[in-house]
A protein has these predicted regions:
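Short alpha-helical elements
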Residues: 1-243
Length: 243
């Protein structure tokens, strides 16, 4: 595994203890700055399942007390964590954090916004607050949440109302437009989970999970940086990973 000398390769294959999560998260933050993604016009915000164990298995897993059971539209019930990421319009992951799978999107987002507004050296993975709004789905709905996030953290969240909401309904055209904007974060998750194999990880320690996650995010942003150097579309990863 150590025969690859290219930094993208070595980043992906080094064991977590050789690259502590703090260093990897710092590298992610550095790449965001290098890619000039700190002040995007908007960021797409979304959560996704991060399973670590088959929830139907008996007994307690390695991360009992940290991970728990949650629901995913794509996976159904799963055991693990909920991952939240913010992505700029070109695909750069500008920040991320995770919590137990049962954590509500609104609760996870509040921690994310609060940490961006009042940075904590132990949680640098969330990145820096941007100047534009966050584009989210209806899972982040809530008038009280909206006002609190805006007033307390300066986070302006735009999301479609639920279809049975008493608020003014959005047109299908507007919903499709918001969905098209948010597609970029789905593309980023596809890279993390499938291209880079995050869904196949079965960590035994929380620190190991943080390192594995940070390594995938760093590799994702590094591939974007490399494509910039080569004059290629930012999200064209397939042949890069075929070296």
């Amino acid at each position: 595994m150590q025969r690859f000398s290219h930094p993208a390769r070595s980043l992906a294959v080094q064991p977590p203890r050789a690259l502590p999560h703090a260093a990897l998260e710092a590298f992610v933050v550095h790449l965001v700055a290098v890619l000039d993604a700190q002040r995007p016009p908007y960021e797409a915000l979304d959560s996704s399942a991060m399973p670590i164990r088959d929830c139907k298995r008996r007994g307690h897993g390695w991360l009992a007390g940290r991970a728990d059971i949650g629901w995913s539209n794509s996976l159904g019930w799963y055991e693990g964590f909920s991952l939240l990421t913010a992505t700029d319009p070109t695909g750069v992951i500008t920040g991320f954090c995770f919590a137990a799978a049962s954590t509500a999107d609104q609760q996870l987002a509040e921690t994310f916004f609060a940490t961006r507004a009042r940075p904590n050296r132990r949680l640098i993975s969330v990145g820096s607050a941007g100047a534009g709004p966050y584009i989210a789905d209806k899972g982040f709905e809530g008038a009280e949440n909206y006002l609190r996030w805006l007033e307390s953290f300066g986070a302006h969240v735009i999301h479609p109302p639920k279809r049975n909401s008493r608020k003014k309904r959005w047109s299908k055209r507007l919903r499709r437009w918001i969905a098209s904007i948010r597609q970029i974060v789905e593309n980023a998750y596809e890279k993390l989970f499938n291209t880079f194999g995050l869904w196949r990880e079965r960590p035994h320690e929380l620190e190991g999970l943080r390192a594995r996650l940070a390594a995938r995010v760093a590799l994702h942003n590094f591939c974007i940086w490399l494509n910039d150097q080569l004059g290629r579309p930012r999200l064209t990863f397939a042949d890069l990973l075929g070296w």
